[in-house]
Amino acid sequence: MPSEIVDRKRKSRGTRDVAEILRQWREYNEQIEAESCIDGGGPKSIRKPPPKGSRKGCMKGKGGPENGICDYRGVRQRRWGKWVAEIREPDGGARLWLGTFSSSYEAALAYDEAAKAIYGQSARLNLPEITNRSSSTAATATVSGSVTAFSDESEVCAREDTNASSGFGQVKLEDCSDEYVLLDSSQCIKEELKGKEEVREEHNLAVGFGIGQDSKRETLDAWLMGNGNEQEPLEFGVDETFDINELLGILNDNNVSGQETMQYQVDRHPNFSYQTQFPNSNLLGSLNPMEIAQPGVDYGCPYVQPSDMENYGIDLDHRRFNDLDIQDLDFGGDKDVHGST
C-alpha cells in the first residue's frame, strides 16, 4: 500500500500587516474622539473595554518556567525562555502577533501600545503610567514639530511680504533712462548708520578744537543769572565773596618769602673753623654745624646793643671784670666749680 504523504499546512497568521492594522485602528479612534468633542460634550467611550479574561497567558503546566508567575496581559513565555505578546481585535476579531521579546517587560510595553491603538481610552494596560507618559511625550514632540514648521513657514512668508512691500526701493539711474535699480533695505540701513557715524566724528572734532566752549559758557551764565524759566538769579552775601586780586597778592607774598629763605639756606657756606674745632661733628648726619659768633656780627638783639644801654642810663665798665676770677663768684654753696668741698 503506497504511503500517503500528507502535506501539513503551516498555520497562517494572516496576510495583513500588523503595523498597518494598528495604524488604521488608531486613525479610526482619533476620528471618533474628534467628532465626540465637536458635538459639545467631552470625549465619550468609543466601545466597550476588552474583557478581563485570564492573566496567566496559557494553560497551567505549559510554556516556559516563569510563565506561571507572569501577570502581564497578552504576554506569555515559550518553553525555551522567550517572551511573546499577542492581542485580539474587538468583537472576536483575529489575533495579532506583536513579536518575540527577551523579557516580559518589553512584551508588556508592546501589548500596551497595541491596546492604546485599538481600544483608545478604554484600553486595559499593563503599565498605564509608563504608557501614558510615553504617549504624552510623543504628542508633545509632534505638536512642537508642527509649531516649528508653522513658524518657519510664517517667517518665510513674512520675509517675502517685507521684500515685496518695503524691503526694496527703486532708484532711477543718472543717465535719464527708464532703468531702475533695486536697493535692499539692509543697504539703506548701512548708509544711514554710516551717516550717523560721520556726524558723530565731526562733533568730536569740533569739541576737540574748542568750538563747543562758547555754548558751555553761555549755559553756565544762564544758570547763574537765571535762564528765564522762573528761576531767580543766585545771590551771594558780602561775607561769602572775596577779591581775587587780594588772594593772589597774599599767595605771591608767601611765595617770595619762602623763596628768599630757601635761597639763604642754599647760599650759606659751611663754617670751616667749626669743623676744625669740632672734627666729630660730621657724625651727626643731617644736623647743620653751629656757627661761632664773630666779634663784628650783629644778630639784631636789642638787649645787647651798647647804644640802647647808654640811652637807658646803664653804665657798663668793662675794666671791673678784667681781674675777676670764677672762684670769686659765690653761687650759694660751699662747693667750688670742680665739685670739691
From Swiss-Prot:
Question: Which residues carry the record's DNA-binding region feature?
Answer: 71-128
Motif Nuclear localization signal: residue span? 8-48
Q: Which GO terms describe its cellular component?
A: nucleus
The source organism is: Arabidopsis thaliana (Mouse-ear cress)
Q: Which GO terms describe its molecular function?
A: DNA binding; DNA-binding transcription factor activity
What keywords does the record list, in alphabetical order?
A: Abscisic acid signaling pathway, Activator, DNA-binding, Nucleus, Stress response, Transcription, Transcription regulation
Q: Which residues cross the membrane?
A: none
Which Gene3D superfamilies does the protein's record reference? AP2/ERF domain
InterPro entries per the record? Answer: AP2/ERF_dom (IPR001471), AP2/ERF_dom_sf (IPR036955), DNA-bd_dom_sf (IPR016177)
* Protein name from the UniProt record: Dehydration-responsive element-binding protein 2C
Q: Which domain of life is it from?
A: Eukaryota
- Region: Disordered; residue ranges are 36-63
Q: What gene does the UniProt entry assign to this protein?
A: DREB2C
Annotated Basic residues bias? 45-59
